[in-house]
Regions:
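Predominantly flavin-linked oxidoreductase catalytic cores and closely associated redox partners
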Residues: 111-163
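Small-residue (primarily alanine) positions within well-ordered alpha-helices
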Residues: 16, 20-25, 112
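Glycine-rich FAD pyrophosphate-binding loop
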Residues: 9, 25-45
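Conserved N-terminal glycine-rich FAD pyrophosphate-binding loop of Rossmann-like flavoproteins
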Residues: 37-60
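Conserved Rossmann-like nucleotide-cofactor binding loop
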Residues: 16, 39, 160
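A conserved beta-strand/loop capping segment in the N-terminal third of enzymes
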Residues: 54-107
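Short, mixed charged/polar active-site loops
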Residues: 3, 76, 81-83, 144-147
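Beta1/beta-strand and adjacent pyrophosphate-binding region of the FAD-binding site
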Residues: 2-16
Length: 163
């Protein structure tokens, strides 16, 4: 197996991994992202976006045209109900949104690819270690196996990741 060289290898193609890939690829770095799931996967309870998340997506120039905007929060505890507006800051909008996670992930994955990141789906990747130093990743099996050396390896595998 030949060793390939990239500036950045990312383990995990969710919002954190793809956001990092978008920024790095737009800056001209060579980026490869390994996502063990399919392109545009769904995630339970992943549809809600806070104003902070919307601000981050705006910075990445991810359009939210079909999102359902929400202007506040409703908290229910027993018979008590309390409604609050989102706090307003200069950095974040004064609204949240509901956007199906499948659409969010698809938009971010597509933006990373459009920026120049190489996106690899349905392939698990694990770090290559030299003592306590990460050299890159190994991914895939058999004829699809790849060995990547990277100047920086980002682990964004989420809560269920093996890393």
């Amino acid at each position: 197996m030949n060793t390939e060289q990239y500036d950045i290898a990312v383990i995990g193609g969710g919002p954190a991994g793809t956001a990092a890939a978008i920024r790095a690829a737009r800056a001209g770095l060579s980026v490869i992202v390994f996502e063990k799931g399919k392109h545009g996967r769904d995630k339970v309870c992943g549809d809600g976006l806070t104003p902070r998340a919307i601000g981050a997506l705006n910075e990445l120039e991810i359009p939210l045209d079909d999102a359902h905007y929400i202007k506040g929060l409703r908290m229910i505890a027993g018979k008590r109900v309390r409604e609050l507006d989102w706090p307003t800051t200069e950095r974040f909008p004064n609204h949240g949104a509901v956007w199906p996670r499948r659409r969010l992930d698809t938009a971010l994955m597509d933006a990373a690819a459009a920026a120049g990141a190489e996106m690899i789906y349905e392939t698990e990747a694990l770090p290559i270690m030299d003592g306590d130093k990460v050299l890159g990743v190994e991914a895939g099996v058999g004829p699809n196996a790849r060995k990547i050396h990277a100047g920086l390896t980002i682990v964004a595998a989420g809560a269920v990741g093996k890393v």
